[in-house]
Amino acid sequence: MFLLDTPIVFELRKARAGGAEAGLTAWASGVARERLFLSAISLVELEAGVAEATRRDKAAGAALRSWIDAQLVPAFEGHVLPLDAAVARRRGQLALAETRDALFAATALEHGLTLVTRNTAAYRGARVKLFDPRGYTADAAEDEGDWRDAARTGPLWLKNLFVRA
């Protein structure tokens, strides 16, 4: 199962217009919804993104707000992981300089998830499982072939969330 870093979520949003990195889109289209999680930190960062976008361009801010409220939050209902005492305790055990990165790593470790991020260097020494989907191809999947056949709703779910025009 996977915890999505906020930049991954933002990049997947670009897939709606065909602008997301191909490897990321290929990977995400093969993952069942039940296997994906967000951190509450991502919601905080997305809200900051709405505020920033609204300051620059009200229409862009409104579009981002609509996507978060109408698609993202409902799709991840029950899959948004909190910053609780266990995550805080785990964060304290990690020797990472950036609090944000340490909280993502702690959340992934506490819940037994693989952190999907492009910034793998930020997590060196955290002993967290990492996955960088850039350059991913379906043929590159090592042991994931069988579950994709069993989870046929995964690709449709992600297409509806991120790809539909």
Predicted regions and their residues:
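Active-site micro-motifs of SAM-dependent methyltransferase domains
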Residues: 8-11, 48, 89, 122
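Short aromatic/basic micro-patch
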Residues: 3, 37-40, 82, 117
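Active-site neighborhoods of divalent-metal-dependent phosphate/nucleic-acid chemistry enzymes
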Residues: 48-50, 74-118, 149-152, 157-165
